[in-house]
Amino acid sequence: MPCLAGPDYSVENMQEMISEWRSLLTADDLKGAWGYVPASESNAFGNTGWWELNWSSQDAANAAWSQWASNTEAVAWTEKYENVLSCDAEGRNALDAVFPVEADHFGALPESGYFYSEFYHCFYNEGSSKADAVAFLPKYTAGVYENTDGFDGTSFHYGNYYAQLNEDGSHTEEGIDFLWASFTNSEASMVKANEVFESNMRSTLFPQFSEFATCREDVIDIYHGWTFYNSEQKDFMPDFSSN
């Protein structure tokens, strides 16, 4: 869901806000949560940040959102921190996400929970669909593993977010079919990962990708990110002072 920093936004207030939010969590179906802060003035959505929630299923997500909306403590928390971070729950985007490479396969992410990310807006060619995009993933993943030496130490992993195009979602207006995302442990690591792709993978894989989709290369959304919650490490807390 899209979020905007308010006049009281600060590292200290974010630490407090996320700590209190975590104390309100009751849904076992929540697998993870991440926050994104713009790292480029040329992002397509300007200074909009994002709060990503990963659920076990669409039904679980819908049920949890319904419960959250009627939770008096959740409403109070939202009002308490609206000048720190204001998020548009009604404008959230429903996305089906796939992450073919484990986040720590090419090195552990920082203990602070920080990560660096790039998102491309992608569109299916006429006659193509999500099925074509999913079928391409094993080919790309194989290319990644074939270049282990290049990616080592970067924490590189990637994901595809397939849009459900919910009526009020911000990505619906843009007509985005799916997002192609890359994640690393730093900006320098992203530069390294992109160099590996350009040198060793693009000539083989890009023509295959172009058979079913195109991505805007004139606008790449770049973010500093933090893990807010990890169901496999429930005691983890991010450190927003580190990047």
Name the predicted role of every residue range.
Residues M1-N243:
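Short S/T/G/P-rich N-terminal loop/turn motif that feeds into the first structured element of a domain
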